[in-house]
Regions:
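Sec-dependent signal peptide recognition
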Residues: 1-3
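C-terminal motif of bacterial Sec signal peptides marking the signal peptidase cleavage site
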Residues: 7-10
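Immediate post-signal-peptide N-terminus of mature secreted/exported proteins
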Residues: 13-80
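Contiguous segments within soluble domain cores/interaction surfaces
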Residues: 17-21, 88, 101
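C-terminal amphipathic alpha-helix
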Residues: 31-47, 51, 122-170
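Extended amphipathic alpha-helical interaction segments
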Residues: 57, 64, 94-97, 101, ...
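Amphipathic alpha-helices that form helix-helix packing interfaces
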Residues: 57-71, 79, 86-93, 107, ...
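Short, solvent-exposed, charged loop/turn and helix-capping segments
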Residues: 92-108, 125-127
Length: 170
């Protein structure tokens, strides 16, 4: 009997129950914004590399990098608009022939991966789950950083192969 009374008392204890107003809804986007600080690692704009390749006027790539930089601020209210803009810029870049020595399968495939990750992130803005959007955006930035890294290392690899070919031909 004592145990039964104790169980009933604990169920009626209003101090331990959470009181939530029936009209109050907590949006998962807002709770995410309030509870977490999210940092996306965006690689620096490869200005030196682009200048050495004679591509400092490559406007499509500048706009693409600016879109990713804007998205890294992660204003959850505008994330869908930012991703839509980013997807458009990625389509523009992928439709055109890449300049200089960048039109190779290694760069083209990484560009496609970035485009796919942007589409995936757009999907998660519509069918939002608190952790899935952030995870998807992290993968988007990893993919973009891999693209830029590959662009910069491709030049070094081409130079090394050229040096090897010159030595073999002598």
């Amino acid at each position: 009997l004592f145990l039964l009374l104790m169980i009933l008392q604990s169920c009626n204890n209003t101090d331990t129950n959470q009181l939530v107003s029936p009209g109050l809804k907590v949006d998962s986007k807002d709770s995410l914004k309030l509870n977490q600080v999210i940092n996306f690692n965006l690689i620096e704009y490869p200005g030196v590399f682009l200048k050495s390749e004679g591509l400092e006027e490559w406007e499509d790539f500048k706009k693409l990098h600016e879109s990713l930089k804007r998205l890294s601020d992660l204003n959850l209210r505008d994330v869908q608009v930012d991703l839509l803009s980013l997807s458009g810029r990625l389509k523009e870049v992928s439709k055109k022939t890449l300049p200089g020595t960048l039109e190779v399968p290694q760069i083209r495939s990484r560009l496609k991966v970035v485009e796919m990750q942007a589409q995936k992130s757009r999907y998660f803005t519509q069918y939002y789950r608190e952790d899935s959007l952030i995870l998807s955006l992290n993968k988007l930035y990893e993919s973009y950083n891999a693209l830029v890294s590959r662009m910069t290392t491709l030049d070094a690899e081409n130079a090394a192969v050229s040096q090897k070919n010159i030595k073999e031909n002598q």
